[in-house]
Amino acid sequence: MVSQSRSKVIKDFIEYYPKYSTPEKTYRDMIKEKGYTHSQQTTKDTQWDILNFMIDEQMKYTREDYVIFDRCPIDNIAYSIWACAKQESDIDTEFVEKCMPLVKESMKFLDIIFFTPITKVAKVELEDNDERDVDPVFVEEIDHLLKAIKKDWDQNHDSKFFEHDDRPAMIDIFGNPNERIQISKLYLDADGDCIGETDSPLVTEEELREMEYYKYKFGISDDKTKALNDPKGLDGGYK
C-alpha cells in the first residue's frame, strides 16, 4: 500500500500503474458528512475522527492489495502539531501525545510514503476549493512540519513517528508528471511492487545517480540523509 501527499500526483500515478486503485471514500467525505471545520480551524474532534478514519481505511486492505491513499496519518499528526503550536483551538500537547502511538503503529501498514515537498523550483500547485486551505503561510508551515518528520525518518533511530525496523520508505517526489513517475520507478517495478520485495532487481548505481540528479535539479538538499541508499531503513547502524 502506498500513501502520497498530493492529490494530483495520485492521478498521474494510477495512469502509469493501473493495478492501483484508491478507496471509494476519503476523509474529506467524512468531514463534509459531519460538518467539521478543518485545516486552520481544526479541532480535537476533527483530528481524532480523521485519524481513526485513515487507520480504518488502511485496515481494510492487505499487503497483496494495490492501493494508494491521498494523505495518511503522518499528514494528520502534522496538522495536529501545527494546531497545538498555534494554541488557537482545543488541541493541546496531551491530545498530540494521545495520537502519536496510533500514528506510529499505523505506519507498519504502509509500504511507501511518496512525499511532495515544496521547493523554490518545484512548487506544488493547489486547487482553490472548499476542501483545502490554500493560505500560502499555512501551507508553508505544514510543509516545514512534514519536512521535519521526513528528517526524523532519515536520522532518528528512536523516532516517535516510525518504528525503526518496521516502517515504510519515505521518498521525496517532485517535478512534472513524467519526472514524478521516473522517480517512482526507482522504488516500484513495472507491476507496482516495491523493488527488493519481489524478484525485481535492486536499485542500480545508475538509478541512484539519476535520483541525485532530480534532487539537485529541484533544490532538494539532504546531504546527511541515508534514505536514498537505505529506503527501508534496514541499516540499523545510523541514528
Language model: regions and residue ranges:
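Glycine-rich phosphate-binding loop used to anchor ATP phosphates in small-molecule kinases
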Residues: T46-M107
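Conserved substrate/cofactor phosphate-moiety recognition/catalytic segment
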Residues: K11-D56
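Short catalytic/ligand-binding loop motif for oxyanion handling, primarily in non-cytosolic enzymes
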Residues: S5-R6, D75-Y79, A85, A122-E125, ...
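A glycine- and Lys/Arg-enriched "phosphate-lid" helix/loop adjacent to the NTP-binding pocket
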Residues: A83-D154, D166-G175, T198-L202
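Short loop/turn segments at strand-loop or loop-helix junctions that form parts
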Residues: K25, D70-P73, Y79, F114-K120
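C-terminal accessory "lid"/substrate-recognition subdomains
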Residues: K151-K239
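Short, well-ordered alpha-helix to beta-strand connector turns
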Residues: Y17, E64-D65, L110-D111
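Glycine-rich phosphate-binding P-loop
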Residues: M1-F13
